[in-house]
């Protein structure tokens, strides 16, 4: 028996999706989201700075982080203090896997799902690794068989790399004693951003009291707030090469966020 619930944010490409999965030998009648998880995976390393992903993990649970931080020193530099402390206090089994690099090496672009799914089966041990590989390769053949042998083989390789690619981190016990850092004061940031927009973007909107919206009863929100929500979720960021630009303006035309704004000017202007 399998049950799945999903949470989404309001963004388009690169938005946050939370998948709540339960499975077992008996019918599942839990009509609520998972709040005591045995396994949690974070598929984008940028999320560690904004989202609380370990508070719902059981003591002794497993946390898989897709990142290129392969040792304790790198994790010390990038993981928030609260996350490291919770990991140590709950005796969480911490794993990392550089799924982005593996996908790029195999020619899969930014498609890391197969790699991370294989890592999930290996870490949880719900079925033997050889059976997981067998079932996943059968699913890949069914899904991608029409796209040719090359695509199928790339997904086969992704399964093989994912099943053995996760590295367990032996973090120091001192993580459990870490104290919170004092956040640096932020200047010129509107109260609306800190009290409403950022909690909503960090998936804590349900916790806001009604009093937080005093003055916004008609549903209107301030304008020009997108500059405060740079998510940093992209693996690669494009750069404009002036020497190759023919000024066709197609980039601006297709951009849904008006990130590129062309101006038609004369030499004098």
What is the predicted role of each segment?
Residues 162, 240, 245-251, 255:
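Short cysteine clusters
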Residues 1-202:
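Active-site cofactor/cluster-binding pocket
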Residues 108, 112, 237, 244-247:
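Secondary-structure capping and boundary motifs in well-ordered enzyme cores
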Residues 229-236, 242, 252, 261:
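Amphipathic, soluble alpha/beta structural segments
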Residues 40, 62-63, 237, 252-259:
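Beta-sheet entry/capping signal
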Residues 224-226, 250-269:
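Iron-sulfur cluster-binding cysteine motifs and their immediate structural context
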